[in-house]
Amino acid sequence: EPQKDWAPLVRKAVDHAGFLPLSLQTGLSFEVLFGFSPREVQQAFIDQVSGPGVYILEAPMGMGKTEAALYAAYRMLEQGKAGGIYFALPTQLTSNKIHDRVNAFLSRILLQDSPQAPLLLHGKAWLKTFSEQEMGEDAAPGKPWFQSGKRGLLAPFAVGTIDQALMAVIRVRHSAVRAFGLAGKVVIIDEIHSYDTYTGTIVDKLVTLLRDLYCTVIILSATLTQSRRAAFLGAHQPVRTDYPLITAVDSQSDRPGPRRKRKSRKWVLSSTE
């Protein structure tokens, strides 16, 4: 029907697929989002996440690494430097717990006309989401209920296990789709110290890819060895024993043009109080 006005239908189809631009509430403070003032280490980390690159926060449990990462992600979304968030964790259980926290976080920063709920991506995600979703149209063939395994990372916001992102750098079907879904997003990789050598090697490749895709990579860990830190940053780092520790490298040296030495920066907080 060439005479038909397809514009409203196209917008509806794109909206149904979850690809409409985000509508954020701007100017929200850390206190408004989380109900308390940021600690010194949290504020220092938030201040340093200024654009695409790799940012590592090493701090003990209970220091609020998750809140710091989420607020840094909010700042990137607010400034138009990111198009979404993927929060990667080592297990299905931790993914389920963080999914609830990210869901509450998004309900505060997004306007009503934006996609509100983050997808949960892991092998048994349906066990958690089945009771939360009204099936409706999503249960029809071709709708997200059947496609989430292939295109889950295309959603603006998702929480899941690290393997969902690792498949972007492994020779598997739809790896290019997964890489495309991560491009330009804030990718938060939590509990990085918990991965074995095999998984850690693939994570190194993933971080390299994410830098090339102009992602903002936030790595959270209790502690990292010097060699692991250097592998993520792609730059030699002097030995430091300070703790907590914030390490960062931006993506400027990865842009096309004459090759330049990658610049890295460190911020040290000498007290955990």
Where is each model-derived feature located?
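N-terminal helicase ATP-binding lobe
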Residues: 1-273
